[in-house]
């Protein structure tokens, strides 16, 4: 019952809002806890992983600057010898298109501080950056891919496509004790699906759950479907004549000159694959000798044009000589060059795509505005 002065009786006060006592109890309950650790999991806003990541973020940014720049900090571990280039990380919080960490495969939480490489599409947790074994492969130029090797290779040396680097790294990490690499085939559908995912290049793939034979078939299919083979037709004669010398030093000098005549993407990819196949030939558990590798990859490296028995035998002989070259010979072609300024800290991987879309949309808007004013001027002149 409400009195004349407008005040409510205690009996009616209980029926005003059934939610109010519950909120008061929660506030009283929260005031009883003095620290965040005393709260139960039900009342916590962040999990333990988020708190650790936020603490790492504070430790890496002691000055408290707003830019959150990570220049000069050593994130990547030097223990993994397969890394061709160190990642150039940038701290970023994602509010849309949130993905998974490349290393642990766990979800990067909404608005949580994480690391993203400026040169490649790699994203990971801050705590996982020192355990990464994924190579940093800068993305190729944005444009239509016509099937040439240079279309899939980065713009800086070593110009090896990301598909080959990621597959080779995973094969060497898990498959050097597995028999029949590059000899045992996989299903065509699995290989095709993996190749499309790797060539799309929108995110760094996780290949830990892929079969090693599928990875090997993906490498072979990629080399077979190139418009120009790894050793182009107009360079066959140079390699054939270089391997006919009897003196070992003469052969090495002639092969060196023949390799230098190749395009840089072909040269770097050939050197990278030779080092990989040499490791496979040296592993007794794989049971793939130099002769077996030459038989398998001779038609793939030289192309299927003029595929006669005599040419295949010649290509196998050339490939045997290339595989028997010392590892230091091929390592000299894989020198890591610094990234250009367009891929530096001020103009990174995602900014290239955003900048392109912004330019296209702004140009369309400006042309429409100019068209509108021109039409208005023409309309006014006709009425005059």
UniProtKB/Swiss-Prot annotation:
Pfam family, one: C1_1
Function: Involved in the morphogenesis of the adult appendages. GTPase-activating protein for p21-Rac. Promotes the exchange of Rac-bound GDP by GTP.
InterPro entries in alphabetical order: C1-like_sf, PE/DAG-bd, Rho_GTPase_activation_prot, RhoGAP_dom
Zinc keyword on record: yes
GO cellular component annotations of the record: centralspindlin complex; cleavage furrow; midbody; nucleus; spindle midzone
Molecular function GO terms recorded: GTPase activator activity; guanyl-nucleotide exchange factor activity; small GTPase binding; zinc ion binding
GO biological process: cell differentiation; compound eye morphogenesis; mitotic cytokinesis; mitotic spindle midzone assembly; Rho protein signal transduction; spermatogenesis
The entry's keywords: Developmental protein, Differentiation, GTPase activation, Guanine-nucleotide releasing factor, Metal-binding, Spermatogenesis, Zinc, Zinc-finger
Domain of life where this protein originates: Eukaryota
Site feature location: Arginine finger: 183
Tissue spec: In pupae, expressed in imaginal disks and only in the male gonad. In adults; isoform 1 is the predominant form in the testes and is expressed at a low level in the ovary and somatic tissues, and isoform 2 is very weakly expressed and is detectable solely in the testes.
Primary gene name: RacGAP84C
Keyword Zinc part of the UniProt annotation: yes
Protein name: GTPase-activating protein RacGAP84C
Stretches assigned to the Rho-GAP domain: 147-330
Species per Swiss-Prot/TrEMBL record: Drosophila melanogaster
ZnF start-end (Phorbol-ester/DAG-type): 86-136
